[in-house]
Amino acid sequence: MSSSRPMFRSRWLPYLLVAPQLIITVIFFIWPAGEALWYSLQSVDPFGFSSQFVGLDNFVTLFHDSYYLDAFWTTIKFSTFVTVSGLLVSLFFAALVEYIVRGSRFYQTLMLLPYAVAPAVAAVLWIFLFNPGRGLITHFLAEFGYDWNHAQNSGQAMFLVVFASVWKQISYNFLFFYAALQSIPRSLIEAAAIDGAGPIRRFFKIALPLIAPVSFFLLVVNLVYAFFDTFPVIDAATSGGPVQATTTLIYKIYREGFTGLDLASSAAQSVVLMFLVIVLTVVQFRYVESKVRYQ
């Protein structure tokens, strides 16, 4: 029986082929992670010229800092809202394509447009619409007696950054959900319809289980997106305010490292965030993926 393993004339060729990826991984991932871990154990002067080993003192100080703990729980809430809302809304719009006969191409194009917008631009767009004095949406809300001012109301500020972040990510999720739904054999849907199953029952009993692998992939991607890629949205929309109500871990790392020049604390926070993402990823692959059945 012939082996399917590719054979190379030179034993060095496989290493040469993977070398670019290994170099990129070392330079842009492993090296920065190692530097962050090293600085998290040091007391560094603001300009980084001198340092002193302090062990775990930075982490002890971190977990006794009420502002950091607030940012930690804000990150958990924000990431949960963005991930769950983004997946549910995108899946809903992807499922609607099945019932749109006229203008389906226009509808699909419209759903993909937000992905072409930069995160900071998306934040500015919704800031204009939710502007307390001149915003179209705030004017509409005022007609119903609702006063909107996200610069002073922490709940409204959180809603704004979650809404803008979800809107920016909808296109990405929609594309994968739509492709997954289109890959489901029509014969299964038609057989269920003949047996008397309605649209909702067909979706939950047939479509949803079959797109579980895609849903799991998007769950991981959206969680990473909520932790890291929403930084421009928060920076442009609220700058972490009001009163740190929208300050997530990634934004706090930036503010303390680049504005406050506290390199040791910023590095310690980076290590904690890295560890948190690793733990959540392991939990997802260990427990969530075990429920997924790949066809």
Curated annotation (Swiss-Prot):
Pfam families cross-referenced by the UniProt entry: BPD_transp_1
Periplasmic side of membrane: 33-80, 131-156, 229-262
Record bears the keyword Transmembrane helix: yes
Topology feature Cytoplasmic, residues: 1-11, 102-109, 178-207, 284-295
Assembly with partners or alone: The complex is composed of two ATP-binding proteins (UgpC), two transmembrane proteins (UgpA and UgpE) and a solute-binding protein (UgpB).
Main function: Part of the ABC transporter complex UgpBAEC involved in sn-glycerol-3-phosphate (G3P) import. Probably responsible for the translocation of the substrate across the membrane.
Assigned protein family: Belongs to the binding-protein-dependent transport system permease family. UgpAE subfamily.
Protein name: sn-glycerol-3-phosphate transport system permease protein UgpA
